Structures are given as structure tokens and as C-alpha cells.
């Protein structure tokens, strides 16, 4: 599918927000990164001061990967379906952390190798499991288009229902292997640079994972620079849908927090699908996965948090949401020097 042209967050509002920051009762720049985040949010909303987020929404994209059969994960493939049920029941880490952050959670089954728990979760399902990318394409061309369209449709559904901030999450045994292939292909690095320990594999597991990425990357590099072909060859329905989701959020002018390795790998592809989409995103955190840092650098995104996390699900991004909320509160609720009757040092050089 083709995405509409992405226009950037409003530069005039960004300038107004920066100017307002300089009038608040604090030394200029004293709130550091919070000031930058507040300017970004104001520009995304097109208003200064910005309004607090009322309906932050986490969407977890779930899918199985054939490459998991190569021994690249510490967990068996059936865990994906089990975790989908856990998300729906409210028992996963993302449910707990999103609750603290004031966000609600949706899980979407794109390619879990099991029947979905209900039609709501499986409404956009493309297939059961994606192909083993070491020896075959993850998807057919038609499935790739369906997955991209599904991700875009999910973004539209959430924005149309009132979501004012989106968080992209993931679940899928083997998905960091596919993600490492995407990142290595788009940043032109070798597998050993992009591969991490994922779910906690040992050294032998890391060697198997690196070999799988090597084999898949050999195939993936043949289709560059086509981002859709890359998703077909080495992604998966969940990662393709994530790419569509991230791109469409930007088209819909809705700020989005990226999570870890799988999400950011998909976002890197999304930036190629919809140039300029990255201006609507912030990196919630930096994962311990080495490929995540590569993807963030390629997107020119600075992570908000670094807590040595590597879970996925949207957890790192959810933890960053209270900081983003604090940035909004500072810009919108603090008094100016004039309002507070406090002398402004900048007015008396």
C-alpha cells in the first residue's frame, strides 16, 4: 500500500512552545529533556500550551515466526498464543505498567500460530505463523500488503475512537530474530553487530540466532532497497502491521511512543514507507538489544529511558508515558514570571 504524504508537527506551535518555556518560573533550559518533549507534544497537537493526554492507547501486535524452530529463543513458540490470552486477561507486564501510566491495552493477533481467543483479537489476522526466513519468505506479496493495511487500519481505528497518543508493542517468539534482519539490512551491518540475547538465550542460542540472521540477511539484501519486499522476505505479518501502524499514526498526526527492538525495527521500515514519519515518534526507551541502538541511531531518536529492559510488549514505552505527561504538565501548568510576580533574570541583563 501507499501512505499519504506525512507533514511534520507544526513548526509555528513549536516556536511558540519554546518561547513559552523561556517565560516560565525557572532558569531557561532547567527542565532539560522535558522541555524538548513539551515542545514536540505542543507541535504534534498544534496548540500551546498542549493539553494533557486523555486516551493513551497501547496496541500489542502478536505473531509467530517460523524461525523460532531454529532454536533462537529460550521459550517455545506456543508461548505467543498463551501470552495473547494473558494480555487479554490483564495479567501481563504491559497491563500492569500501562495501568500505572494511565493507558489502556489492546492486543491484535496478526500471525499467531493458533486460533485467536475471539473475533475482536483476530479481526485483522493475516495467517497462522510467518515463514522461516532462513529458507523462505516470511509472507507472500499479497499477505504483506494485507498486513501493512491491517496495521494502518488499526491506527485509524484507534485515532477515530479518540486515542490522542499511541504506544506500539509486540509479542512473538522469534520476532527479535526477524527484527535483527530488518535492522542489519537497513543499516548495512553484519549479524554479530545486530544480534542480542533476546529472551535470555545462552551463548549457544546466540550462535544459533546469529546464524539464522546471517542466512536470512543473505536473502534479504537481494530485495533492497524496497521496504515492502524486505517485509515480505524477512519480516512477518506482525512486523509488517507494526510498520503500517507507525506510518499511519504519522499520517493521522498522532504522536507515538516506540518500544524496543521489534517495534523500532518495524518503525525503521515505516520511515522508508512514509518519509518523515519519525518526526511524530519518540523512543520510549533503549533496550539492551544491540540492534535497537542501531535502529534508534538510524532514526535519529534519543530514548527517554534506559532501564536495561528487553521485554517488549510496549513496556518501555509505557514507562516513558508518565515522563511525557510531566512534560505536558510543566508547559501547561507552570506560571510565567509575569503571572507569578517573580523577577525574570533575562529581563535584567
UniProtKB/Swiss-Prot annotation:
Pfam families: DBI_PRT (PF02277). The active site is at residue 313. Keywords: Cobalamin biosynthesis, Glycosyltransferase, Transferase. Its EC number is 2.4.2.21. Pathway: Nucleoside biosynthesis; alpha-ribazole biosynthesis; alpha-ribazole from 5,6-dimethylbenzimidazole: step 1/2. It comes from the Bacteria. GO terms for biological process: cobalamin biosynthetic process. It catalyses: 5,6-dimethylbenzimidazole + nicotinate beta-D-ribonucleotide = alpha-ribazole 5'-phosphate + nicotinate + H(+). Residues 1-20 are annotated as: Disordered. Transmembrane segments: none annotated. Catalyzes the synthesis of alpha-ribazole-5'-phosphate from nicotinate mononucleotide (NAMN) and 5,6-dimethylbenzimidazole (DMB). This is Nicotinate-nucleotide--dimethylbenzimidazole phosphoribosyltransferase. The gene is cobT.
Amino acid at each position: 500500500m501507499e501512505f499519504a504524504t506525512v507533514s511534520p508537527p507544526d513548526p509555528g506551535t513549536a516556536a511558540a512552545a519554546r518561547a513559552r518555556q523561556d517565560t516560565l518560573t525557572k532558569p531557561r533550559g532547567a527542565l532539560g529533556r522535558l522541555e524538548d518533549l513539551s515542545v514536540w507534544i505542543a507541535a504534534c497537537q498544534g496548540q500551546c500550551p498542549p493539553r494533557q493526554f486523555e486516551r493513551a492507547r497501547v496496541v500489542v501486535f502478536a505473531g509467530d515466526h517460523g524461525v523460532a524452530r531454529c532454536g533462537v529463543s529460550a521459550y517455545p513458540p506456543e508461548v505467543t498464543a498463551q501470552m495473547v490470552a494473558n494480555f487479554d486477561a490483564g495479567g501481563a507486564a504491559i497491563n500492569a505498567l500501562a495501568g500505572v501510566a494511565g493507558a489502556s491495552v489492546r492486543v491484535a493477533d496478526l500471525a499467531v500460530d493458533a486460533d485467536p481467543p475471539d473475533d475482536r483479537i483476530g479481526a485483522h489476522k493475516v495467517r497462522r505463523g510467518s515463514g522461516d526466513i532462513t529458507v523462505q519468505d516470511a509472507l507472500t506479496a499479497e499477505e504483506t500488503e494485507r498486513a501493512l493495511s491491517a496495521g494502518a487500519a488499526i491506527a485509524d481505528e484507534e485515532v477515530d475512537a479518540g486515542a490522542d497518543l499511541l504506544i506500539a508493542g509486540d509479542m512473538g517468539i522469534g520476532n527479535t530474530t526477524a527484527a535483527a534482519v530488518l535492522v542489519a539490512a537497513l543499516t548495512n551491518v553484519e549479524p554479530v553487530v545486530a544480534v542480542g540475547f533476546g529472551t535470555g538465550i545462552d551463548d549457544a542460542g546466540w550462535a544459533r540466532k546469529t546464524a539464522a540472521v546471517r542466512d536470512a540477511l543473505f536473502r534479504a539484501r537481494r530485495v533492497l532497497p524496497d521496504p515492502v519486499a524486505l517485509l515480505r522476505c524477512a519480516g512477518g505479518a506482525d512486523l509488517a502491521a507494526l510498520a503500517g501502524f507507525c506510518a499511519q499514526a504519522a499520517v493521522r498526526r498522532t504522536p507515538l511512543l516506540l518500544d524496543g527492538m521489534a517495534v523500532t525495527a518495524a518503525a525503521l521500515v515505516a520511515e522508508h514507507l512514509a518519509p518523515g514519519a519519525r518526526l511524530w515518534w519518540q523512543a520510549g526507551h533503549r533496550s539492551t538489544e544491540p540492534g535497537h541502538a542501531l535502529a534508534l541511531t538510524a532514526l535519529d531518536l534519543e530514548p527517554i529511558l534506559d532501564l536495561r529492559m528487553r521485554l517488549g510488549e510496549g513496556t518501555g514505552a509505557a514507562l516513558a508515558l508518565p515522563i511525557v505527561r510531566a512534560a505536558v504538565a510543566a508547559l501547561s501548568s507552570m506560571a510565567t514570571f509575569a503571572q507569578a510576580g517573580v523577577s525574570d533574570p533575562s529581563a535584567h541583563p
